[in-house]
Regions:
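GST-like domain detector, emphasizing the conserved glutathione-binding G-site
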Residues: 1-134
Length: 135
């Protein structure tokens, strides 16, 4: 069974939950309270050094980065397939997560950081870690 470390407030967690549901995969949700800074717990940071959600554990392997998780889950659970067979359609499909990862998510992350979690992050990161996180 998959363990999904996630937060209901996380867009990235939501897209992984959506794929797990679509695939009919059995999974256990482990909620990480971002407002309380639970992502900075040393045990969680062993799984995800960037202290972000989601993270999955499948067959003892740690998988991070939500878009890569989706690709992984589509291969591990082939039915129903999420990726079309036709190369051009596969290309078109790839444009959406690329836009989300490169444009939308950084903007949302900046706002979320500024409004909701900067006090937690500032208390739990060194200045070098903050620079690396937002690089």
């Amino acid at each position: 069974m998959i363990q999904l470390y996630q937060s209901m407030q996380s867009v990235c967690s939501g897209k992984v939950r959506l794929v797990l549901e679509e695939k009919g995969a059995e999974y256990e949700e482990i909620d990480i309270n971002l407002q309380k800074g639970e992502q900075f717990d040393p045990e969680y940071k062993k799984l995800n050094p960037k202290a972000v959600v989601p993270t999955i554990i499948h067959n003892g392997k740690v998988i991070r980065e939500s878009t890569l998780m989706i690709n992984y889950l589509d291969q591990v659970f082939p039915n129903p397939p999420l990726t079309p067979d036709a190369p051009y359609l596969k290309f078109r499909m790839g444009l959406f997560p690329k836009m989300m990862d490169e444009e939308v998510h950084p903007a949302v992350n900046l706002i979320t950081y500024a409004v909701a979690t900067r006090h937690i992050r500032a208390a739990n990161y060194t200045s070098e870690e903050l620079e690396d996180h937002f690089a």
